[in-house]
Amino acid sequence: MDVQTLMAASAGAVASRLLCHPIDTITVHKQTIGKFSFKTMPLKAYYRGLPISLTLITPATCLYLSTYVEAKRRFKPSVGEGAILYSICGMTAEVVSSFVWTPLEVIKARTQISQKGSVINTISTLARSEGLKGFYRGYWMGVAIYLPTTVSWWVCYEESKKYLQKQSNWDISVIAPICSALGTVVATTISTPLDIVKTRYQVATSSAMRKAEYGLQAEKELGILEIAKLLFSKHGVKGFTRGLFTRMCYIMPSGMISMSVFESFKSKDID
């Protein structure tokens, strides 16, 4: 993986985060507290958690994409081009990058629903109350969620990219966002129910979440199954689709921007 590829991945990650972070904040509010109002939420609140996102999103995205590219280079001679290769590479990239993504998601989600909205306060409170394991809260669930999500996304993306490259003379900067959007629709629909449970589990011990959702039960540690049962009992099936459209509105442009920039710079290296 050369420097140009890493710079391209970084540029795409930063650009997509700056443009799409407010939508992500709205999604987290809907998935956790369940309350959101444009009238009562100040403008700066939409960017809660942005500093930590920008700090970690770049190395996390670079790690994810570089792992995928390297895995593709190593496995392609023995596996061949196709869905199996994309699945293996996607899973490898997800498992490796989740070591960075999980703490980011925990800190970001807690900061976004916090009244103070301070990253430093979120980190210090989490470290003091839960220690290191608090930052990796929901790691294995995240891996379980994002493995099928990653596989479905990369298979849709790569297969549709091959098809469009054969059937059209479009530039990769046009093909990449189209294929990314298609992969996002499929992957997001598959992953949203479990992602909601994961997000609620990651912020379950925060004061904002306890006050909004769990009441007296907040004093005890809530497991993943308990959170899922509480969600179903209070909101029914639709509770597991909360923020689906908003989440898709965030992930889709974010992925389109990232992949368009990345592919424009490094499409020859990937292929």
Swiss-Prot record:
Solcar repeats (start-end): 3-74, 81-163, 171-268
Top-level taxon in the UniProt lineage: Eukaryota
GO biological process: iron import into the mitochondrion
Native source organism of the sequence: Schizosaccharomyces pombe (strain 972 / ATCC 24843) (Fission yeast)
The entry's keywords: Membrane, Mitochondrion, Mitochondrion inner membrane, Repeat, Transmembrane, Transmembrane helix, Transport
One Pfam family, short name: Mito_carr
Membrane topology, record value: Multi-pass membrane protein
Subcellular location per the Swiss-Prot or TrEMBL entry: Mitochondrion inner membrane
Keyword Transmembrane annotated: yes
GO molecular function: iron ion transmembrane transporter activity
Protein name (database record): Uncharacterized mitochondrial carrier C4G8.08
Transmembrane segments: 5-26, 49-69, 84-104, 138-158, 170-190, 240-261
Disulfide bonds: none
Chief localization: mitochondrion
Family note: Belongs to the mitochondrial carrier (TC 2.A.29) family.
A GO-annotated cellular component: mitochondrial inner membrane
